[in-house]
Amino acid sequence: MRTEVLGDTGFKVSRLCIGTDYADVYGGSSLGRDILLEGFSLGVNFWDSSESYGSYPAIKEALKTLDRGDVVITSKTYSKHEDGAKRHLEEALRETGTDYLDVFMLHAVDTLEDFKNRRGVLGFLSEAKGQGLIRAVGVSTHSANLALALADVPEIEVVLAVLNMKGLRIHGGNVELMHSALKKLHDVGKGVYLMKVLARGRLGDRAEEALRYAFKIPYVHAVSVGIQNLSELETAVNVEKVADIA
C-alpha cells in the first residue's frame, strides 16, 4: 500500500482510507474491528469517521491492539454551534478511547454562507488544536465552489470532497471545477482526500473502474471508501496496488 503525506499536516497516510459510515458494521459487531485490523495489516492506516456514523466502538476495539500513533483518525461535526461541536469532540475522544484525533472536521459544508455561519465552530476547533485535542482542522464538502474557496482559508488544513468518475453528488459546480479546486488545494499545501467515489453504491457495478479513476488523480492524497466486509476491503486494496498515478 502506497502512502502519501497529507499536505502540510505532515501525516503519513495510506492511499486507501477506510470509510466507516455503516453503524451496523462498525457500531456493535466485531466485523468493523476486524476490517480495521485487517486493513492495517495490509498497510491501511487511515480511518474516516464522524459523530453521525456510529462507528466509534469498532475504532476503540481496534485501537486496543495498535499503537495510537500508527493510525490517522478523522471525525466530524455537523454542529453550527460551539457547544455542539465541543460535545461531539468530547464524545469522539471518549468513545474511541483516545486522547486526540488527527483531524476534526466541519461536516457537509456546502455553501460559503454555511461556512461563514460555522466560523464560531472553526474558532473552537482552532482552540482545541492548541490544546492538543486535535492535530488538524478540516472541512468535508460536496461543493466544488466551496472547495475552491477553502484554498484561501489558512485555518483549514484538510479537505474531504466528493468526486467520482460520473460527477454524481457534486453540488455547487461540476467535475471539471472540482478537479481544479482539488488541484489548487493540493498545490497550496492542504491535505486532500475523496469521498463517495462509488456514489453511495450507484457505481457499485463498476467499482473497480471507479476506484481506479479516484486512485489515479495525482493531486489527491487518499481515497475514502466505505467498507462493509473483508471482500470489499480486499478489492479496494488490490485496485490501489495496480492503479498507476497519471
Region annotations inferred by a language model:
Residues 1-70, 213:
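N-terminal binding-site loop/beta-alpha segment at the start of enzyme catalytic domains
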Residues 7-10, 41, 59-70, 90-99, ...:
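Acidic (Asp/Glu)-rich catalytic clusters
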Residues 86-105, 127-131:
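CE4/NodB-like, metal-dependent polysaccharide N-deacetylase domain
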Residues 109-246:
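Beta/alpha (TIM)-barrel catalytic core signal, keyed to glycine-rich beta->alpha loops juxtaposed to Asp/Glu
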Residues 25-39, 82-97, 142-149, 205-213:
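Short, acidic/polar
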Residues 6, 18, 47, 59, ...:
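Conserved, mostly hydrophobic/aromatic
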Residues 11-16, 43-46, 67-71, 98-102, ...:
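Short, well-ordered coil/turn segments that N-cap beta-strands
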Residues 24-29, 48-57, 78-85, 112-116, ...:
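Acidic-and-aromatic substrate-binding clefts and catalytic sites of carbohydrate-active enzymes
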